[in-house]
């Protein structure tokens, strides 16, 4: 985990073991062991000098050996290129060297162009061909399970009718998820001098951003309501002031 704006060069150093195991890893462990996810993605940044996609401690020792993950590990897009591209991590000099580092650490699949050099790396003795075959097997198993090689009429994913799009059940579920994801803080002893029936202050850069409500890897909803819009619609008699307060990726605070 690191700052969004410099994730391609960021190096997380001296992370306390307790913080790693109690703060960062529990969610991933639960997804692997309880949720049985089929695929895990390694991120851009470095941890103690090693990019996540060439970090055997996390990909092999923790993810596979300790947690028992059997699925596919893929890189974030362009992450392996960051190993050797000028001005980035600088852990490799060439795409071939970067590819060898990633494959040997346990990254099965790359989103990018570096893995085109796998044959060259194998011929140079930088990668054992057995590792390539192992990764290929994991990739093919995942695609077989998805039905990529089957006829459309035999694949359940192609049989989903269009009328489920934006259906009531899905909208109700989305609303429930949104409601349960909200954390409410009480204004005890009028710490903030606000009368909830007269004046409401909505703060935060995401309060008036419909894209961030769903994330940047999602479909397009038929309609959406931002937090700010929802509060204004509900509290029509109150003065609702919006203060972005800060930005998501820049180290600055806006005037309120």
What are these regions (language model features)?
Residues 1-256:
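Glycoside hydrolase catalytic-domain context in secreted enzymes
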């Amino acid at each position: 985990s690191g700052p969004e704006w410099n994730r391609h060069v960021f190096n997380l150093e001296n992370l306390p073991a307790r913080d790693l195991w109690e703060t960062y890893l529990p969610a991933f462990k639960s997804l692997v062991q309880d949720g049985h996810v089929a695929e895990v993605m390694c991120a851009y940044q470095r941890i103690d000098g090693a990019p996540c996609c060439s970090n055997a401690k996390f990909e092999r020792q923790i993810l596979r050996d300790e947690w028992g993950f059997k699925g596919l590990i893929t890189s974030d897009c362009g992450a392996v290129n960051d190993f050797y591209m000028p001005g980035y991590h600088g852990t490799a000099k060439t795409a071939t060297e970067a590819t060898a580092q990633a494959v040997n650490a346990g990254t099965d699949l790359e989103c990018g162009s570096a893995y085109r050099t796998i044959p060259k790396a194998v011929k140079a003795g930088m990668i054992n061909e057995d590792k390539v075959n192992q990764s290929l097997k994991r990739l093919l198993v995942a695609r077989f399970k998805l039905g990529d090689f089957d006829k459309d009429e035999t694949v359940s994913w192609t049989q989903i009718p269009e009328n489920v799009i934006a259906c009531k059940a899905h909208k109700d579920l989305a609303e429930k998820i949104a409601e349960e994801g909200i954390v409410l803080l009480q204004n005890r002893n009028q710490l903030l001098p606000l009368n909830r029936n007269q004046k409401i202050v909505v703060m935060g850069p995401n309060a008036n951003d419909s894209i961030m409500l769903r994330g940047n890897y999602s479909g397009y909803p038929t309609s959406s309501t931002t937090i700010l819009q929802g509060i204004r619609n509900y509290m029509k008699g109150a003065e609702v002031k919006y203060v972005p307060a800060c930005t998501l990726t820049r180290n600055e605070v806006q005037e309120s």
